[in-house]
Amino acid sequence: MKYLLFSDIHGCLPALEKVLDFFEQEKCDMMCIMGDIINYGPRNRIPEGIDPKGIVERLNALADKIVAVRGNCDAEVDQMLLDFPIMETYALLVDNGKCYLLTHGHVYNKENMPKGPYDCIIYGHSHLWELSHNEEGQGIVNTGSITFPKGGNVPTFATLENGKFT
């Protein structure tokens, strides 16, 4: 399976459309969204192209291909609009004998990794892309942000296929 991994949409439909175009062109099987889907949040500027209703419509059309977790800007009212679950702090993805912990990053991240039998933590929240390992050999993947990248980065996301990240 080929997974598209991203986070921090923050209600920006043009950013989501670019990612969904990639999803289709690269023939990804599933997408994992690490939170902050509809709301731009009180600390961010209002994104150009904000369209919460458009975000909901586009993602609901792909609901059977989405695994998502709750970000710090996601609310219970958002769940009422979405046809896929988003309210959990984390989810486990098992593929090719490896276990991946999917989370937003505001609770669990590389500085606060929960104990558990997983091979890699995948998160967003900081809007800073990262691909590394900790001292225990667990993978650390921060998908950055497709809407508000920080650190001079361009919008970022990742793919996972056969245990390899790109």
Language-model regions: role of each:
Residues M1-L13, C28-C32, I140, G151-T166:
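Amphipathic repeat-derived elements
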Residues E88, C99-L101, H106-T166:
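Conserved beta-sheet core of the metallophosphoesterase superfamily
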Residues K2-D95:
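Core catalytic region of metal-dependent phosphoesterases/phosphodiesterases
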